[in-house]
Amino acid sequence: MYSSAWAVGEALDPTVKRFAERRTVAEIDWTAWRAADPATLVFVRRADELLLIRKKRGLGAGKINGPGGRMEPGETPAECAVREAREELGITPRGLRWAGENRFQFVDGYSIHVHVFAAGGFEGSVRETDEAAPLWTPVDRIPYDEMWQDDRLWVPHLLAGRRFDGRFVFEGDSMLDHAVELL
């Protein structure tokens, strides 16, 4: 179930919340838009398999996705992607490549800007943690029905090596509108 980080009592900055209640991508001035949270996702590929996780807690708990999470102050997106893979799976991604970015606006006011990375390998042993259960998935059988609705719109570009820029509007777990451009 969807839950935003600020719902526990943190107040959203008014400049971040100003696009709350917008229900289409066209209603948002993306040049002025700012995310409440910068974050990353990293997808490790091994031959014809993709390393995914089933999230155990936080935003997207119960869903399948790539490892990732919110950036810490002073951290670059690449540093965050590596840290999150270590925390969630016990591995260090290698051959990290920036693949694209996705901007998400939720109608309740929460927003997140996700930098997406692809990795051609990793060091360490993949293990389950209290945050995530790992699963290697054949690239021709990605479990989109168990993922966020937007994933089926940009993950194929990631797998094909194409860079992308996505913008999405969500109400809870439901995607209301989207736009994905190739870079």
Regions found by a protein language model. Name each.
Residues 61-63:
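A positional/architectural concept
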Residues 45-49, 120-125, 161-162:
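Short, charged/polar surface micro-motifs in flexible loops or helix N-caps
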Residues 1-21:
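N-terminal amphipathic/basic-hydrophobic helices that include classical n-h-c signal peptides
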Residues 71-95, 103-158, 176-183:
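Unchanged
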Residues 25-51, 67-70:
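Conserved N-terminal beta-strand and adjoining loop/helix that marks the start
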Residues 4-9, 160-183:
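Charged phosphate-binding loop/patch that engages nucleotide di/tri-phosphates or the phosphate backbone
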